[in-house]
A protein has these predicted regions:
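Short, recurring structural edge motifs at helix starts
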Residues: 38-40, 69-74, 189-195
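C-terminal accessory segments
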Residues: 256-332
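Positively charged n-region of N-terminal signal peptides that target proteins for export
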Residues: 1-3
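Structural detector of coil-to-beta-strand junctions
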Residues: 33-39, 61-64, 95-96, 101-103, ...
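Hydrophobic h-region of N-terminal signal peptides that target proteins for export
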Residues: 6-16
Length: 364
């Protein structure tokens, strides 16, 4: 097994506000079997920040960033309030649906903020796990999760997890046999069975879900997880038919999902990504709902170790997905007519149309 160990020898009087910062580093793990990847010492309570790093791996078992535990230990919640932001995680191993490599793992720590990251082919992308602990200020927001062989985000036995303004994109197929396709959702929510822990009150808003096949977008595995569950103001698109969902093992179409009371304000619309790497919508997707997390990734930005992504503030009309367009929409024209009903009111020679927060301004 290969591990990247970070050992910080801290005084016995260490305070909870002390900071453990890993920033601007490049990690490449070439072990293809079991590897624990970037493993961080969690024996003391600290403010853990993992920022603007690049992590590449090909391990089929283990982690890319191990910043949590699989069970209750004496180190539980030592990383409460951790921040994992602006990183790029790239997995280059065998594209097999049986691969269980955990990308960003923060088990048994609450209020963790996982934001502005790019995950490329990471088998199990972002894992929020516990024995029924409750998240109150944490969030999974403004991440791009591209082509996860298994699942994009997992909520296992943790209450109150918020999943806002992420972009999910998958070219995968449905599971047809061992190692081929995935049976999981882009988001999986389920109880922890050992030790038993609930996963209530998850909130899924302002995300973009794009699939080539009729994969499951949101998979709520236990009926009990619907207690306090909310999903709305999202964008869904499937190239092969109606977007699909699952509750307690039953597959549901978008129509059936909405009949259960979910995603009533969401839309099925193609975001027309400019390309399938940067995942920038061709136009603004701005039918979202405001949250406290009001900065997204600039449409023109990219990830590089040591550099923080450029962030753009949301406007009055909330944009969905991880990318946020800056400024007004401007359309230049050469000749035109302005109509009032069926009557031509004004001949337009040349100028521009500026669309700002729903208001249209014609400038000549």
């Amino acid at each position: 097994m290969k591990r990247f160990w970070f050992l910080f020898f801290l005084p016995l009087s260490l305070a909870a506000q002390d900071t453990l910062l890993i920033e601007g580093r490049t990690f490449v793990d070439t072990l293809s079997g079991t590897s624990y990847g970037v493993t961080v010492n969690r024996t003391r309570p600290v403010k853990f920040i993992f920022r603007n790093n690049s992590v590449t791996g090909e391990n089929t078992v283990g982690y890319m960033l191990e910043a949590g535990q699989e069970n209750v230990t004496q180190y539980t919640n030592n990383f409460r309030g951790a921040e994992i932001t602006g990183n790029k995680f790239t997995w280059v191993g065998d594209q097999n649906a049986n691969t269980i490599t955990h990308g960003v793992f923060t088990g048994y720590h609450t209020d963790v903020r996982v934001m502005y990251n790019y995950l490329d082919y990471v088998p199990m992308g972002i894992i929020r796990k516990s024995n029924g602990m409750t998240d109150s200020t944490g969030v999974v927001a403004y991440n791009i999760i591209r082509n996860p062989p298994a699942v994009g985000v997992v909520v296992k036995g943790m209450n109150g997890v918020r999943i806002y303004n992420n972009t999910f994109y998958s070219e995968d197929s449905l599971y047809v046999g061992p190692g081929i396709g995935t049976w999981r959702g882009l988001i999986d929510i389920y109880e922890n069975d050992n030790p038993v822990g609930s996963a209530k009150g998850a909130k899924i808003k302002n995300n973009i879900f794009y699939t080539k096949s009729q994969l499951t977008n949101i998979n709520v595995m236990n009926e009990s997880c619907l207690d306090g569950f909310e999903s709305d103001y999202n964008i869904f698109w499937c190239e092969s038919g109606e977007p699909m969902f699952m509750i307690a093992g039953s597959r549901l179409t978008f129509t059936q999902w909405r009949a259960r009371g979910y995603d009533l304000h969401s839309m099925v619309v193609n975001p027309y990504f400019i390309n399938t790497v940067d995942l920038v919508p061709e136009r603004r997707m701005q039918w979202g709902t405001p949250t406290e997390f009001n900065y997204g990734i600039a449409a023109s930005d990219y990830w590089e170790a040591g550099f923080y992504p450029t962030l753009v503030r949301q406007g009055e009309y909330w944009q969905q997905g991880a990318r946020v367009y800056e400024g007004d929409i401007v359309i230049f024209y050469w000749r035109g007519k302005l109509f009032d009903g069926d009557t031509t009111a004004i001949d337009l020679k040349y100028g521009k149309i500026v669309i700002n927060q729903g208001e249209i301004h014609i400038q000549q």
